[in-house]
Amino acid sequence: MVILAIGGYDPTSGAGISADIKTAHTLGVYCPTITTSVIPQNNKMVYEKFDLPEENIKNQFKAVFEEFDIEYVKTGVLTKPAIDTLLKYIDKYDLKVICDPVLASTTKFSFVDEKLMEKYIELFNKSFLITPNKEEYKKIMEFIKNNNLMIRNDLYILATGIDDILMKNFKPIKTFKGFRVDKEVHGTGCVYSTAITAFLSKGYDLEEAIKEAKRFVLSSVIYAKKSKFGYNSNPTYINKEKVIKNLSYAIYLLKKMNFTLIPEVGSNIAESLPFPKDFKDVAALTGRIIKNKLGGFYIVGDIEFGASEHIAKIILSASKFNPEIRACMNIKYDGGLIKLLKDKFAVSSFDRKEEPPNVSTMEWGTKIACEKFGGVPDIIYDRGGEGKEPMIRVLGRDAIEVVKKVEVIQKIYNTLM
């Protein structure tokens, strides 16, 4: 698969064509690019917008279209020569354009004047989808109204925000729910629209492409890279296949260990998709990790989504405090071990005696432990209760990280023996 990205060059690689390339590569799609402008910027300010000359832009189009068969095009920051040239190529090659109308930077530097806005309207009328944020959508609609312009009715418009609204004939047809993440991340619009384009090129229908791209961009936000003045987008794709691969490798690592911290009820290990909604978004063993008579262990069952509501409830509760935490494993409790672990790990706990009636123990206990700690610790334990075995739960960003923590815990436990 090949998609073309047309837009500005951001030397910090947080946005623009650098972010487009990273996004497409992460999704397994090749992405040639056409640069319209060089925009020295960072999370503090835009220094300037230097537009490349028309002849250079035409030569970039010529080079790309001579080399590749292009069907899908994603656009970011555009100039008049870039739009004029693209319009000709749309007619010649019947291109499907996903236009992200970048009207201004997050630092409020304007990329568009009235004449260029008129050109954008011309491009919208030949696009398949436009993806303005809700502020940009409002400005576009006001400009159209004030200048007696028209946009064709069958254009798909995705007005983006926390929740995104897909429209056709200017009427909402689907809402894509999101989550508020307390980070101002540079480049999310680029990542989102490029991801939609990439999924469309893979054969997804529009609604499925948006749904998958939404999950992708949310992951890119929670794993965003911190720099001096803010956060830069970090294209990250965690789908069901990735979760199952992580769990499979984590179990492989576990098999190589002399793992003895197995509770009487057995252990299980789980990992979720980003922002899990319910236990169906969490994969785990359909069985358990259980002791054998030779001092080793058996791994019973397969890895499947929705396999364990019990351990899923821990992840579902913890992810509300920190969405990066997506994995958990339960292991044997030992009071002496807990004392030693407090020197190496962040540890919190809950007391089953304080559990209110009619609640899920795991959801309530995880919430209490996280509130006590002020975030998600590495370890949450409880000392059990009537008919309930005491337990240690190890949490982490993925199943591999969890097993590596368990390996350290096992070594510490071995010193007690």
Curated annotation (Swiss-Prot):
Annotated EC: 2.7.1.49, 2.7.4.7, 2.5.1.3
Single GO MF descriptor: ATP binding
PANTHER family: HYDROXYMETHYLPYRIMIDINE_PHOSPHOMETHYLPYRIMIDINE KINASE THI20-RELATED (PTHR20858:SF17), PHOSPHOMETHYLPYRIMIDINE KINASE (PTHR20858)
Annotated residues for binding of 4-amino-5-hydroxymethyl-2-methylpyrimidine: 41
Key words, A-Z: ATP-binding, Kinase, Multifunctional enzyme, Nucleotide-binding, Thiamine biosynthesis, Transferase
Catalyzed reaction equations: 4-amino-5-hydroxymethyl-2-methylpyrimidine + ATP = 4-amino-2-methyl-5-(phosphooxymethyl)pyrimidine + ADP + H(+); 4-amino-2-methyl-5-(phosphooxymethyl)pyrimidine + ATP = 4-amino-2-methyl-5-(diphosphooxymethyl)pyrimidine + ADP; 2-[(2R,5Z)-2-carboxy-4-methylthiazol-5(2H)-ylidene]ethyl phosphate + 4-amino-2-methyl-5-(diphosphooxymethyl)pyrimidine + 2 H(+) = thiamine phosphate + CO2 + diphosphate; 2-(2-carboxy-4-methylthiazol-5-yl)ethyl phosphate + 4-amino-2-methyl-5-(diphosphooxymethyl)pyrimidine + 2 H(+) = thiamine phosphate + CO2 + diphosphate
Residue numbers spanned by region Hydroxymethylpyrimidine/phosphomethylpyrimidine kinase: 1-235
UniProt-annotated stretches for the region Thiamine-phosphate synthase: 236-417
Protein species of origin: Methanocaldococcus jannaschii (strain ATCC 43067 / DSM 2661 / JAL-1 / JCM 10045 / NBRC 100440) (Methanococcus jannaschii)
InterPro entries membership: Aldolase_II/adducin_N_sf (IPR036409), HMP/HMP-P_kinase_dom (IPR004399), PM/HMP-P_kinase-1 (IPR013749), Ribokinase-like (IPR029056), ThiN (IPR019293)
A GO CC annotation given for this chain: cytosol
Protein family per UniProt: In the N-terminal section; belongs to the ThiD family.
Pfam families: Phos_pyr_kin, ThiN
GO biological process: thiamine biosynthetic process; thiamine diphosphate biosynthetic process
UniProt function note: Catalyzes the phosphorylation of hydroxymethylpyrimidine phosphate (HMP-P) to HMP-PP, and of HMP to HMP-P. Condenses 4-methyl-5-(beta-hydroxyethyl)thiazole monophosphate (THZ-P) and 4-amino-5-hydroxymethyl pyrimidine pyrophosphate (HMP-PP) to form thiamine monophosphate (TMP).
Protein name, entry field: Bifunctional thiamine biosynthesis protein ThiDN
Pathway recorded for this protein: Cofactor biosynthesis; thiamine diphosphate biosynthesis; 4-amino-2-methyl-5-diphosphomethylpyrimidine from 5-amino-1-(5-phospho-D-ribosyl)imidazole; Cofactor biosynthesis; thiamine diphosphate biosynthesis; thiamine phosphate from 4-amino-2-methyl-5-diphosphomethylpyrimidine and 4-methyl-5-(2-phosphoethyl)-thiazole: step 1/1
